[in-house]
């Protein structure tokens, strides 16, 4: 992924909500913290939920799993509805923005956009593109890049040097046509995690998040935020 490099976004609802507002999304849906993965803490998350973003560490164990998963799907196949909006990641550290795009694009019918919304324009213009074409389109989309950079400086922790290697990565978990999809621009395709519904999306997405944590039990750097109706 050599080439463009952006500053990483924090998994911080204040940052992501402000970022989306600047891109012209009406705040009828807002990101909120998921404070824990047990039922009691999940019950504190406002419903309905239409997407979950997971921030996790890219470790050696994870990379081994990712390679095995990719090979298995390539040999066995999987069902992926054509309704899924998926894009590749070609910009280093842009995974936060790509996660947000995946979350909004796959729930576009639920969202309200302000007049002249940059994000709405990007989604409309890229609607018929391939995942690779969408990635290249984002590379040249200055309005989103500039907003991303502004948001990256607004986190609670100081933004790292732009050349610093970052081993944390965002993915989006969304419900499309009755199935739960993991959308990760580092992967060649969406991952179908089985059936879900609007009512059970949060719990089903958290089960996927738990698998990430179980693969790396010594790691603590996991953070989930949910896109909830405000």
From Swiss-Prot:
GO biological process entries: protein catabolic process; ubiquitin-dependent protein catabolic process
Domain of life assignment: Eukaryota
EC assignment: 3.4.19.12
GO MF, one example: cysteine-type deubiquitinase activity
Keyword annotations of the record: Cytoplasm, Hydrolase, Phosphoprotein, Protease, Thiol protease, Ubl conjugation pathway
Enzymatic reactions: Thiol-dependent hydrolysis of ester, thioester, amide, peptide and isopeptide bonds formed by the C-terminal Gly of ubiquitin (a 76-residue protein attached to proteins as an intracellular targeting signal)
Regulation of catalytic or functional activity: Inhibited by monoubiquitin and diubiquitin.
Subcellular location: Cytoplasm
Extent of the signal sequence: none
Top-level EC class: hydrolase
PTM-bearing positions, type Phosphoserine: 130
Record site feature (Important for enzyme activity), residues: 184
Interaction with ubiquitin as annotated region, ranges: 8-13, 219-224
Function summary: Deubiquitinating enzyme (DUB) that controls levels of cellular ubiquitin through processing of ubiquitin precursors and ubiquitinated proteins. Thiol protease that recognizes and hydrolyzes a peptide bond at the C-terminal glycine of either ubiquitin or NEDD8. Has a 10-fold preference for Arg and Lys at position P3''. Deubiquitinates ENAC in apical compartments, thereby regulating apical membrane recycling. Indirectly increases the phosphorylation of IGFIR, AKT and FOXO1 and promotes insulin-signaling and insulin-induced adipogenesis.
Quaternary structure and partners: Preferentially binds diubiquitin; the interaction does not hydrolyze diubiquitin but, in vitro, inhibits the hydrolyzing activity on other substrates.
Descriptive protein name: Ubiquitin carboxyl-terminal hydrolase isozyme L3
